[in-house]
Amino acid sequence: MRLFCFHHAGGGRLTFNPWRRALRPGVEVVPVEIANRERFATLRHLVDEVNDQLRSALDGPHMFFGHSFGALLAYRLACRRAVEGSPLPRTMFLSAYAPPHLPPPLHAVDNLDDHQLGTLLSDLGGMPHEIIRWPALRDRAVTTTRIDLRLCMTDDEAETAALSCPIHAFGGSDDPLVSESDLHEWRSRTSEEFSVQILRGGHFYLNDRPQLFATLKPLLSTVGAARC
């Protein structure tokens, strides 16, 4: 079964490349990345683009994993597909992001200048050391992150019916942006199975891949019995 993976703000498909080998043979990891996201005025426009690009690929059995910004994108994509009557993911793994009825984790991003935002990303573990060492790469990463976080701010939280597919919310025990109680708020967004998985670490707890896979693999193994 395919696992479509949606990266964090400022991230890209490379985040999930190591997952391919780790989750074989039962799961095909498909990283999702939309280039030039600055061309989208709102998150709704980005969701439209992702839905159009993935439409044929999502006809078969599939799952979503989204981290931070990617969790919101994955959730809104599932909502869009529910409205149009398209197949939903067999399950969704939503990581390090609060549901849309709560404030976005970095809703005050425009109160931070580029240096402050870069420092915050580094402190959170979201900026690799090889990028920090190169000012041009660092500046590009900060700019892309700001674009994605601004898209989060455009999310239109209309009344949304609970989705008919399981949701498993993941988070770090020491995440300064998203609390365990925030993650439990996803319960209202599904009419099916729900769980919260708290792993050791901060906002980027998933950098500890052995720990993540030890928790994720048993959940993946049960997805075949789920029906959405």
Predicted regions and their residues:
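Catalytic histidine neighborhood in serine/cysteine hydrolases
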Residues: 188-204
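Conserved alpha/beta-hydrolase "acid-adjacent" motif
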Residues: 176-182
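Active-site nucleophile elbow and catalytic-triad environment of alpha/beta-hydrolase enzymes
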Residues: 142-160
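Gly/Ala-rich beta-loop-alpha elbow adjacent to hydrolase catalytic centers
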Residues: 66-70, 74
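Short beta-strand/loop motif that positions the catalytic acidic residue
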Residues: 169-171, 175
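Active-site nucleophile loop of the alpha/beta-hydrolase fold
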Residues: 34, 79, 90-103, 124-125
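Active-site catalytic motif of lipid deacylating hydrolases and related acyltransferases
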Residues: 1-61, 100-117, 199-204, 223
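Post-His helix in hydrolase/transferase enzymes
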Residues: 206-222
